[in-house]
């Protein structure tokens, strides 16, 4: 009996000494200057402490409700994604992403499965905070648009660490399919559509399991959480150029939809990121600041005679303007030197499948690389 007691005691101690496990957080965001009630799921001893990347995001545990927090977001918190980490004396759970938005939060209200019985979103822009709560769940949201307006609807889920592959479908009031998107900047969908007539429209969403299995049915569960920003106003897709150099003032063009003031001045940038002000629902825009020189591509540079001359180290901002476009850059190198060339595009949310090739001054190909580390 004494031996059995000792064995059980040791087992119990080892279980309670484990670091907390937090499988999901819902909702995964809130509007700045607001409060929200959030819940976590997993295995942990209550209450857990919370570290936030932003000082203005506070998680206050509800002592009488295990797993629930009152989240307070200060007005001065810059909108965007932030890391939060749940921890106790035994360790920490992996960090999770929490989004702070400018637009009004709209919590999902079930039932909203049917296209003809959707949840009504009173005004745009809005950020839907929802979840596909069970297998087969479809969420439907209705809103109004006017002729000529461009709708932008973007989901954040997979990019926030949620294991699902979602889709979006836009219908008119009669149920006719108008637009569809499955994957955009990642497995998360982004739907763009220009309205052709005044009316009410319904955005429907569902998800598949990821990684995929042999089941083709829509997936769902407590951890299948998402946020969707819906707007008929400004939205930034990217900038040109894609970065700035430290201490170098630049004019940056915002590229996207429904934009009015498309050019922003960046003066003497420093640090790792420069925050660009914009009225866009997904603004402000965080622009990388480089600690090296940047060259912006100058066309034409399709052949060796017109190649842009660069000096190392350098980052080049460029674009493939049309099918068949080839960009060339000339540089000097000495025998025995080693140089590394990296292209970032797919990782930054673009669909380009780029290729790098190295030629000598006579045009002879010395090396070529298409895909590196299983990425495009």
Residue ranges and their predicted role:
Residues 95-124, 281-313:
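Predominantly extracellular/luminal regions of secreted and cell-surface proteins
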Residues 3-13:
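Sec-dependent N-terminal signal peptides
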Residues 8-9, 85, 113-119, 215, ...:
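Intrinsically disordered, low-complexity boundary segments flanking structured domains
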Residues 81, 85, 95-98:
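Hydrophobic or amphipathic alpha-helical targeting/insertion segments
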Residues 18-66, 75, 79, 88-89, ...:
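Acidic, Ser/Thr/Pro-rich low-complexity intrinsically disordered segments
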């Amino acid at each position: 009996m004494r031996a059995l007691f000792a064995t059980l005691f040791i087992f119990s101690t080892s279980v309670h000494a484990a670091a907390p496990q937090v499988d999901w957080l819902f909702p995964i965001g809130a509007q700045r200057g607001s409060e929200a009630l959030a819940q976590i799921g997993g295995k942990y001893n209550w209450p857990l402490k919370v570290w936030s990347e932003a000082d203005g995001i506070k998680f206050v545990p509800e002592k009488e409700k295990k797993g629930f927090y009152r989240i307070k977001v200060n007005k001065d918190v810059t909108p965007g994604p932030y890391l939060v980490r749940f921890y106790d004396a035994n360790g920490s759970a992996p960090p999770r992403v929490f989004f702070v938005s400018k637009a009004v939060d709209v919590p999902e209200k079930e039932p909203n499965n049917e296209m003809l019985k959707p949840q009504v979103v009173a005004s745009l822009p809005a950020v839907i905070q929802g979840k596909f709560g069970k297998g087969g769940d479809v969420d439907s949201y209705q809103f109004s648009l006017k002729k000529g307006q461009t709708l932008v609807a973007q989901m954040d889920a997979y990019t926030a660490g949620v294991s699902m592959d979602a889709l979006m479908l836009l219908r008119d009031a009669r149920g006719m399919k108008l637009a569809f998107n499955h994957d955009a900047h990642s497995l998360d969908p982004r739907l763009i559509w220009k309205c052709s007539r005044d009316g009410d429209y319904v955005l429907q969403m569902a998800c598949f399991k990821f990684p995929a299995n042999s089941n083709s049915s829509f997936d769902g569960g407590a951890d299948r959480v998402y946020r969707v920003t819906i707007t008929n106003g400004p939205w930034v897709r990217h900038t040109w150029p894609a970065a700035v150099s430290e201490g170098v003032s630049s004019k940056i063009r915002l590229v996207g939809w429904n934009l009015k003031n498309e050019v922003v001045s960046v003066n003497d940038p420093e640090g790792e990121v420069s925050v660009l002000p914009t009225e866009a629902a997904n603004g402000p825009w965080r622009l990388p600041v480089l600690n090296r020189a940047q060259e912006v591509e100058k066309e034409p540079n399709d052949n060796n005679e017109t190649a842009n001359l660069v000096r190392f180290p350098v980052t080049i901002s460029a674009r493939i303007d049309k099918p068949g476009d080839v960009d060339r850059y000339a540089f000097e190198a000495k025998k025995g030197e080693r140089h590394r060339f990296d292209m970032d595009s797919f990782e930054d949310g673009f669909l380009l499948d780029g290729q790098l090739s190295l030629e000598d001054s006579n045009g002879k190909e010395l090396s070529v690389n298409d895909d590196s580390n299983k990425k495009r």
